[in-house]
């Protein structure tokens, strides 16, 4: 099948599994790299193979250098495959690498796919731990442009402004978030929105508006 169709993903994958299970590491690695560096290989197959690479690496002692090098090669071969970059970020967290390095990968994802909500949430949560309020405001403002119906980004935006003591901007963000409430909205988050709005209005002396 491989001779007839050199890009046959199923056939190449089966051959890779055969060599891998037989302990023929050299041939298995050649096939693995061939598939991972091909733009014709599906994102799902690449993710499965990279998870196997991570598993094998951890069982062999956990040296992250060759794994990260492989990730970089795969990303360079297809920069638009954000799934691989997200998996790299997850691996870096597994290896307890510095948050700033993980953040760099997530920023690369957002450069390619600015509407990737998962990458943006992960990045904001990372920055939150270091109280990087200005960066969070910037990321959240971008988020509501690309994901205007995602309430969590209005929450992040409002809370970051609130932490900066900019209550007017915080109130504006929370009000915009409330306008996105629907039947599927998280009830706890909705409650938080109204509670925070009430606190801000109370601080501003608008006790009527607070209730």
Specify the residue positions occupied by each region the protein language model found.
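Alpha-solenoid helical repeat scaffolds
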Residues: 1-209
